[in-house]
Amino acid sequence: IIGDTINGAITTADNIAGKIGII
């Protein structure tokens, strides 16, 4: 499902950014 893939990628990127301290 394209929508799930895009949402998953955004969530993963947000989690990584949060761990680094960007967000």
Curated annotation (Swiss-Prot):
Where is the protein localized?
A: Secreted
Q: Which family does it belong to?
A: Belongs to the Frog skin active peptide (FSAP) family. Septenin subfamily.
Q: Does the keyword Transmembrane apply?
A: no
> Which tissues carry this protein?
Expressed in skin glands.
Main location per the UniProt record: secreted
Annotated function: May act as an antimicrobial peptide.
Alphabetized, the UniProt keywords read: Phosphoprotein, Secreted
Q: Does the keyword Protease apply?
A: no
From the Swiss-Prot or TrEMBL record, give the protein name: Septenin 2
**GO annotation, cellular component aspect:** extracellular region
Question: Could you read off the lineage of the organism from its UniProt record?
Answer: Eukaryota, Metazoa, Chordata, Craniata, Vertebrata
